């Protein structure tokens, strides 16, 4: 069971969401872009787009192989994301890279990065997540650290404060349609 959390509008008109199971491994999720303007369901476009679009309505927001099930996630996991409204499409996010526990020569576990070789060899004991602040550039397909993670510290929320126009207010009801307009006039 997947939940879509923290929806945020993106400059491209889509919604950025965190897809996360109810019990998320390592507090992590996958980032998705959801096309709410053209779809009503994953593979069901709106009526004007019927026969034109086939889906899916949601696609990964990054190029990383992120998995939301127990065990290693080769592309790491995300804990929060905030699209920058600066015309670049970049996303400020918190991310933990994939880390494994490997038994050292002295029998002690050491933290090592995920690699295709380690994953193919069955190294599935994951290390505790290490969330830092990153910036993702979809045009360049790059992720760069903004704040280097520190063992024992979790960066869990990011926001970008910048001036922008207020979004439109969608009222629950419309006077004269959903209720008597005279009642609204009376206050």
Question: What role is predicted for each listed range?
Answer:
Residues 1-37:
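Beta-propeller domains
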Residues 6, 21-24, 69-72, 119-127:
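Short consensus segments that form the blades of beta-propeller domains
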Residues 17-23, 82-85, 93-98, 122-125, ...:
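Beta-strand C-termini and the immediately following turn/loop, strongest in propeller blades
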Residues 1, 37-73, 150-164:
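Surface-exposed loop and turn segments in beta-propeller and other repeat-based domains
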Residues 15-19, 33, 90-96, 100-101, ...:
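Residue position within the beta-strands of beta-propeller blades
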Residues 24-35, 100-115, 120-121, 128-134:
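Structural motif
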Residues 35-39, 137-141:
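Short loop/turn segments that connect beta-strands within beta-propeller blades
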Residues 2-14, 70-88, 157-184:
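Structural signature of eukaryotic scaffold interfaces centered on beta-propeller domains
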